[in-house]
């Protein structure tokens, strides 16, 4: 699509108040992006719809990190066909990483799609919508070296907790990962804009903020020379009673300075998500992770020595290229040694154009991948159950997030260490901090009573 043609189209959304329904898939960054998209569209005069049934426009904010993530989107597009048939003027758009990966090819493969926009193109959505409303296929998948959306005030629904993106993109080029190709190079927001947004959130009564980035540990504000540990230190001072979390970290970049800051500042939560992907140094080298098993364990030991009550989670890939039974055994032994609170576990799926896709052979049979994944999951569930049972008798400060999915008589919230806690309702409300004494546990949930 030519930029001059986009410029010629005058937005008429303010007059029409078209209704946009947004559906989000994938990581926390995508959910944060949806809040940015909502703000951009709202400022352009569009109304945000609560249901696809009443929408004039349906946007799917997508993930491309694994093949099954993209298949979910394709299935969803198929499900939308009856709505499109019922209302031919309905505009269906695919946003985010899947749009960036497939680009205009998506129009050919999914005829229902009228509009595509990559993660750095959301400011152009009003113009793209004007083109789509005129009957044209509209696309913008240009990546940017500067875009951080730092000046956009996200339209958030959740008043007690918030995502705040501090950087975008990734420069690590892990062999299996498509993120650098769908989200572009690393860019950090200015420190002042982050602190200003934290202050605004604090003034609005937000109780907990999660700082987001593909690799927050490589955050760097060129103007002030601020790195992530210093940013976290300054962020903790905005409101000492507002919890602050962060995700995601790359093991090679997490610093002793950051660990010291978390240990010192009482409102920085004792929880670190530290994806390792494999327990085998041979696999880590093939994956281009930039560290060995021993390097990783040194970081884990440092965290546990400085923050003894810190919970740690991870990501694991089973069946990466050439993985042997010995490599798999090394992953299982790492689980036993680290004792993660939980792990996000996946079988390896080839992502087109990644280094692994072009240079390595996906030679582990599917049944072997699945068997190894099952063994990883079974061991991790056993470890999680042991850790959670050890919490019985302890008391946690819990931020109430909402009703338990299993019972309307129970509240569900999170402890500082990110463990999910459920307890019978009392006089407290969503957004309140409550001290809860733990009386029981499963492998994924703590159960207790409010004090």
UniProtKB/Swiss-Prot annotation:
Q: Where in the cell is it found?
A: Cytoplasm
EC number(s) on record?
2.8.4.3
- Say if the entry is tagged with keyword Transport: no
Q: What terms describe the molecular function in GO for this protein?
A: 4 iron, 4 sulfur cluster binding; metal ion binding; N6-isopentenyladenosine methylthiotransferase activity
Instruction: Tell me which residues bind [4Fe-4S] cluster 1.
Output: 27, 63, 97
Domain Radical SAM core, chain residue ranges per copy: 156-386
Instruction: Tell me the function of this protein.
Output: Catalyzes the methylthiolation of N6-(dimethylallyl)adenosine (i(6)A), leading to the formation of 2-methylthio-N6-(dimethylallyl)adenosine (ms(2)i(6)A) at position 37 in tRNAs that read codons beginning with uridine.
Q: Which protein are we looking at? A: tRNA-2-methylthio-N(6)-dimethylallyladenosine synthase
- What organism does the record attribute this protein to? Chloroherpeton thalassium (strain ATCC 35110 / GB-78)
